[in-house]
């Protein structure tokens, strides 16, 4: 059956990864860029030995936390529009367990990444080994089973020859636009070093062709009829539109037929913010302009969107009595949502073909799009100039903290800097082609409403899983994707404390990243949530046991790692820090102490959250009753 080559399982894995290519729109390039690893006794003598012997073209990076390096790998793949990946290798037990949150993040966002956790012995001879857990009812269960529900594909290798079919399945999944996500291949640590006579044909160059899925004539005609029969259609731009590269087609249809664009977090920066018909973010963290347009719509054209609760305001954002839905998505499952007419096809191709079928059509929005955008831009301008007053300050988040408490924060943190003012100062100061990243807390809402990205694919938000700690780790992935650009992590103190280990990795490998740390000494977003629903401020502020506000010197922490650091508590200090940071070759961190309750509030939106049905607090009871009342106007599925 052809020539054989004797390799260990790990050597075969690395040899195979070097031969995987992807072909999109006539361009062919290697699919696997490199591998992140933290060596332990489960992988150092297998995968470690294989990489040392011959890594091929793979770039190898030593991570500092398994979740962190997997986030970096995911961010790289997401930024590369899912056309390149990094693999991630860990040891057994806790190292593998640390992948669970990162795998869930990749799965929720449909991002391909190859996870290779080591496993316990296939022979079971030394069981239980170090870092192995035991279950009385099954010896077949290991820590790696926890990765099953958060993987798009999962397998366990207990024989070398199993690797071949497993890798083919994994790469089929990772290169499928409709079901891309994390592929997990667990390799027993004794099997990693076990040799086998592999067929040489397994290691030939393999090209994974990503052909654009074509819409059928029935789909095109049905979609065109829906649009032409509508009066006020709105296009909801999702992440699938960005991965498809549908920017030009979206702009052309929007301009030709006067159809407004609104965006999900994943779809933002598919089309530049200053495009006249782009009304910005949609839903709970959306702009007033986008949400007003959506309420007027009689047709929602969803392009590559999952219709999450944040995009649909928990299914209250639209007038479901009159609005119809047209979904264009490579995923059949996503296309079926909200009783839509389904076009299961590539966004770029479909929009290009639809354009010519709409000749003679024009929406009835008239000048409304411009008026809505102007109204919102005026509000954005106001939010850029918020100033704190110690006597009578009216924060964006109202009726939570008294003036006395706000003054206490100003004194404890030595700042009077509002969050929106700081954020928009950054937007105006950093290079236009910079890439920003964020994931959790109040900052994603501020960014979706306020941030203007005028270079496509420069806004990178992980808001499928909203995983705290993705922000700093992911910035390393951005830098690997864009080595010649400035990349910025926009992160709150809560997320920074959760995970920032790959800042050290960035410094170690001279991959300059910039961390913009907003410190309001607490979990401010969740504090807003609890107080908005009748509860008091309970264990979301960072206070000491004698109720003093915690003031951490994060700049000193980062300085200890080797970063260039700055403290900026005024607009002037912030501008100066940003300008100086551009000149640095090493990673930087700018620490900003910002006042609580100065993030943006919601605009004509609602979030369905669980509220206590029974409470001794009247305010909680009222919040529950208000929630039940609002549900009466929400679509139930």
Swiss-Prot record:
It comes from the Bacteria. Keywords: Hydrolase, Magnesium, Metal-binding, NAD, Thiamine pyrophosphate. Involved in the cleavage of the C1-C2 bond of 3D-(3,5/4)-trihydroxycyclohexane-1,2-dione (THcHDO) to yield 5-deoxy-glucuronate (5DG). This is 3D-(3,5/4)-trihydroxycyclohexane-1,2-dione hydrolase. CDD domains: TPP_IolD (cd02003), TPP_PYR_POX_like (cd07035). GO terms for biological process: inositol catabolic process; isoleucine biosynthetic process; L-valine biosynthetic process. Its EC number is 3.7.1.22. It holds the Pfam family TPP_enzyme_N. It is an enzyme of class 3 (hydrolase). Its cofactor is Mg(2+); thiamine diphosphate. Thiamine diphosphate binds at residue 66. GO terms for molecular function: 3D-(3,5/4)-trihydroxycyclohexane-1,2-dione hydrolase activity; acetolactate synthase activity; flavin adenine dinucleotide binding; magnesium ion binding; thiamine pyrophosphate binding. Pathway: Polyol metabolism; myo-inositol degradation into acetyl-CoA; acetyl-CoA from myo-inositol: step 3/7. Binds 1 Mg(2+) ion per subunit. Belongs to the TPP enzyme family. Mg(2+) binds at residues 493, 520. Residues 442-522 are annotated as: Thiamine pyrophosphate binding. It catalyses: 3D-3,5/4-trihydroxycyclohexane-1,2-dione + H2O = 5-deoxy-D-glucuronate + H(+). GO terms for cellular component: acetolactate synthase complex.
